[in-house]
Every structure is written in C-alpha cells, then in structure tokens.
Regions:
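Surface loop/turn motifs at the tips and blade-to-blade linkers of beta-strand repeat domains
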Residues: 51-54, 103-109, 154-158, 162-166, ...
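Beta-strand-rich domains and repeat architectures in extracellular enzymes and scaffolds
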Residues: 26-33, 49-78, 299-306, 322
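Asp-box/WD-like beta-propeller blade repeats and closely related beta-sheet repeat scaffolds
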Residues: 105-111, 115-117, 130-176
Length: 391
C-alpha cells in the first residue's frame, strides 16, 4: 500500500491516494428506543451507537465555536415551517451519547444547513439556510437560545412544491470558505428545464456580511452536499430523473469559479460527459468538466467528509465518506449506504443495511468527522444521529 505524508493531506487530494480494497462488512445490531431492531453492516473494527434519537428529518451538522454540535431538522418531506435547529449537548464520549437535545431555533422553513463564522473582530456568527433566505445572527458561546435578531443576507426563489415550473429542491446548503467567503447552493426548480432565474441550479458566493453576491458555479442540478476542505470547495450533485434507471451518474466535484457543470443539457454517465437529447446546446458538451468521481444513478449523494489524519484507520484513511441517501423509488435500490471514495479508485462501501429487500431502515444524510477515529452521521428517515468510532 502506498502511504501518503500527512504534510501533503488536502493539497494532494486531487491526486492518487493510497490503494485500498473493499473492506469486509459485518452486521452490527441496532436497538432504538422506539423498539425498532435491525443491523447495519460496517467493518468489524468499528462500532456504531445511536447518539441521539427521537428527531424528525434530521439533516446537516455544524460545530459551534464553543465546540457544541448543532444540527438541522426539516421536520418532514413537505414544504413546511416546522423546522428546527437543535443543540446536541452534554456529550459523553464513553457511552457515545448526547445527554441533551435542545431546540435552539424553531418554526423554520425547511432548514437544511447551519454554519458558524468568526469575523476579524472576534464576533461569532450563526448562518442559517432556509428555502427562501439566508440569515445570520450574532452568536454567544454557551447560549441555548438566540441572543440577537437575525439579519437577512440573501433571498432565494421560494415557490415551494407548487411552483408551476416544477417546485423541486427546497434545500439550501452553506459552506464557509477557507478564503473568507460564504457559499450557498440553490437547487433547480425542476427535473430538467431551462431555468427562469439565474440563481437556480447554482452555487453563489458572497462576503460574510452578504455583500458582493455573485454566481460562483452553474449547471449543478442540486448540489446538496457542499463543504470547503483544504483548498477546494467540494460538492455532491444529483442528476436528472428522466434518463432511465441506470443514467445519469450522481456526481462529485471540486468546484471552480465561473465553471458551468452542464445541467440540463449535459450529464455524466460512468464518468463521461454526454449530451441530453432533450436539450440543444450550441456549444455542445465538450467543455463541460468530468466529475471528480461519480456514484450510481439516483443514489442521491448528500453530505460528506474527508478523513486525512495520519492516525486514521487505514480502512478510511485518505478517503471521502459520502452519505448516499438512496433512490426515492426503493425498487431501484441505489444508495442507502455510506460510500467510501478515493479519486481514481473504485467506489467502496463503508456501511450498508439501510435497505433490505423493500424494507427501509434509514437514509443517511450528512457525515461529520469528529477526530481521526470517529464521526457522526444523520439519518433523516429514522430521525437518529449515529456515532461511529474505531474500536
């Protein structure tokens, strides 16, 4: 096995990393407080613990400046104003459980993402992405409810699910850039169409105060996973639904400024960019970049994190773990797992068992690396946050 110096870590992430083989997965019994019992399959040298239960459509994580974990909850699949941002508090590393789940913000419209930023003056800010807007508010360390009023930094198309052009994709995702910028992904209004608003199917960039807003990247049908790692802004992207069960790929990109990633006229299949015959594009698809990597069609790639610590177990070292939420149609059966991805290598499975036959036990949504030996992931079907650690 080729080993990579820790000094190179993320600056080297776009080149070949250590070669690995599909790890053997073994059943790990899961017993939830609501009485449900099943098994999730993962490597034998890891254990999995339900760290928080009783949530609804729990989604994306962020760690506050005071080290507490925050997580969003969209409540259900409807366009609603019942969403919540929770504080996951009183963490016990021995038991792998949170002692308290505290509602921090309530009555929110489909909150998918929350992030924190500390400005040059040392002021902490909480950023919240709802369907219709991006807001920020001052954050005081240790607080259990907001201490200041939110200010609106940006507004987004908010036609909901009844929009005449389709009404798709209610989520917005925030990433804090290592360059001091704020990024927000806005999904398309449709399965495949020519959009009426430029902000749709894009990632936008702005200053922390909301000024100098611009389109950063386009042609991204729904970039739900968005995270700045090292020197790169990475994104997962969901492909169109009308090209059959085997096409197109779900894709993963290291985004570049002012690049068009092709949707709706171009799509990826087995990593190659092809033209969608439904749409005519004067320039064709020859200048559309191929993805960093790709996932099975309709597997719904969402949140992810990168495991680069020199002391990380070799199973996941120098790999991305990606939550494949799963196809809406369970009969397709793609996704429903945590995938393990290294550039230039075959996709591997770190965890599965969320779908057994026609029975759905969960749908992973986001992954958050805690340290070199452990991570959290959210399950928005069961309303559970899991803790996974090396034994």
């Amino acid at each position: 096995m080729i080993k990579i110096s820790a000094i190179l870590i993320l600056s080297f992430v776009c080149s070949i990393t250590s070669w690995a083989q599909q790890p053997k997965l073994v059943p790990h019994p899961i017993h939830l407080k609501n009485g449900k019992q099943f098994s999730l399959n993962l490597p034998a040298n890891f254990e999995i613990i339900p760290a928080a239960e009783g949530l609804k459509r729990v989604r994306f994580f962020a760690q506050a400046p005071d080290r507490r974990m925050f997580v969003t909850d969209m409540y259900d699949l409807t366009d609603n104003k019942k969403g919540t941002v929770y504080i996951l508090d009183d963490w016990n590393a021995d038991t792998g459980k949170f002692g308290k789940i505290i509602p921090y913000l309530t009555g929110l419209r489909n909150p998918n993402s929350v992030q924190f930023y500390t400005d040059a003056q040392g002021q902490d800010w909480l950023y919240l992405a709802e369907t219709h807007q991006l807001t920020r508010q001052k954050f005081s360390r240790g607080e259990t409810q907001p201490s200041s009023k939110a200010e609106v930094l940006a507004t987004f198309p908010d036609y909901g699910l009844s929009y005449k052009y389709g009404g798709w994709h209610l989520t917005r995702t925030i990433a804090i850039g290592g360059n001091g910028k704020i990024y927000v992904s806005v999904g398309s209004s449709c399965n495949a169409c020519v959009e009426k608003e430029k902000v749709r199917a894009s990632v936008i960039e702005m200053n922390p105060d909301g000024s100098e807003q611009r389109i950063y990247a386009t042609g991204l049908r729904n970039a739900v996973g968005l995270k700045w790692i090292g020197r790169f802004l990475f994104a997962t992207n969901q492909g169109s639904d009308h090209l059959g069960r085997k096409k197109p790929d779900e894709t993963f990109y290291a985004l570049k400024q002012d690049v068009d990633y092709g949707w709706p006229a171009c799509y990826s299949w087995q990593g190659k960019v092809l033209a969608d015959p439904k749409f005519k594009r004067a320039s064709g698809c020859k200048n559309i970049p191929s993805p960093y990597t790709y996932f099975p069609s309709h597997s719904s790639a969402l949140g992810f994190d990168y495991f680069d610590d020199p002391h990380t177990d070799s199973t996941i070292k120098n790999a991305f773990l990606v939550a494949l939420h799963g196809s809406t149609d369970e009969a397709i059966g793609h996704g429903y797992q945590i995938a393990m991805m290294r550039k230039g290598q075959k996709l591997e499975t770190f965890m599965d068992g969320f779908l057994v036959g026609k029975k759905v036990y969960g749908r992973p949504a986001d992954i958050y690396k805690i340290d070199e030996k452990s991570f959290y992931f959210s399950d928005d079907r069961a309303g559970v946050i899991y803790y996974v650690r090396e034994k």
